[in-house]
Regions:
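Membrane-embedded alpha-helical segments and the immediately adjacent membrane-proximal loops
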Residues: 1-281
């Protein structure tokens, strides 16, 4: 009879496989990668069959910009200067964030692969499952990630539905929001993917810290030197993560703050228009 623990492990790995496929469809990963619950991490070389999804995302981003230009009157025309500038910055910065994210994913393919390959090499060298952590520890990390992932999706879906069908329905803001949904969604997925790398790195660093604490108590100098090599590997992984996500995440965070600021202004404008009896376009 299958135990509850084995069911949780199986569901966690299958769910994580689906998440990896999702990140490939979005264009973040341009190489095949799988994490099996028994064989561990499998990483393939860069291939065009995987990169086709990156090309599709790039095409969608270009089409999104072209359609916004063609429908300029419906998106921006007739608004007050402050409202129009808000929409310009919000849409333009969001679209730029997507372009930079896709550029980082393409030009940083080998950097990206090196992150996962170093985790695999650490596991092979130390007889562990993923980096320095064993399978039960990895399952706990994945469960924590899935919880955060589902909460973010649920909150965003509720907010978007409320806005789309209630708050701005029938207004010009409603039309603009539909165009801004694509870069807005890609921005959130980039945050989530970065969060995954942070959680995995944190789990490995904690495991290294535990090893160092045990070895310091025993006073084993030779094994301390081995841990120094492991620390070097984790440092290289961290540097690769910073290189892969650095510029795109800086722009992504700026885009998120701009989104919040402009949305707060929009709410203020809506409240003022309701108070004065004006119709919000």
């Amino acid at each position: 009879m299958v135990s509850v623990e084995s069911m949780i492990v199986g569901v966690s790995f299958r769910a994580f496989s689906c998440v990896l496929v999702l990140f490939q469809l979005i264009g973040f990963m341009n190489f095949p990668i799988k994490l099996h619950q028994t064989t561990g991490l499998t990483i393939g070389d860069h291939r065009w069959s995987t990169s086709i999804w990156w090309i599709i995302q790039l095409a969608l981003t270009v089409i999104c910009g072209i359609m916004a230009k063609r429908n300029y009157d419906n998106l921006f025309n007739g608004l007050l200067l402050t409202d129009a500038m808000n929409n310009y910055f919000k849409f333009g910065l969001g679209l730029l964030t997507v372009f930079v994210t896709l550029a980082d994913s393409w030009f940083g393919i080998e950097t990206h692969r090196s992150i996962w390959m170093r985790y695999r090499d650490l596991a092979t060298r130390n007889g562990t499952f993923f980096g320095l952590i064993e399978r039960p520890q990895l399952v706990r990390v994945l469960i924590r990630f899935f919880f955060v992932f589902l909460v973010i999706i649920a909150v965003c879906a509720i907010v978007e539905r409320q806005f789309y069908y209630d708050i701005a329905y029938g207004s010009q803001w409603h039309y603009f929001w539909t165009y801004n949904l694509y870069p807005y969604t890609i921005s959130h997925f980039r945050h989530v993917y970065h969060l995954l790398h942070i959680l995995l790195m944190t789990a490995n660093v904690r495991q290294l810290q535990k090893r160092l604490s045990r070895l310091q108590q025993l006073g084993v100098a030779q094994q301390l030197e081995a841990c120094r090599v492991i620390y070097g590997q984790l440092w290289q992984i961290n540097e690769a993560i910073n290189e892969l996500f650095g510029f795109s995440q800086a722009l992504n965070i700026a885009c998120s703050f701009a989104q919040i600021a402009f949305d707060l202004y929009w709410i203020y404008a809506m409240l003022m228009s309701q108070d004065t009896g004006l119709k919000c376009k």
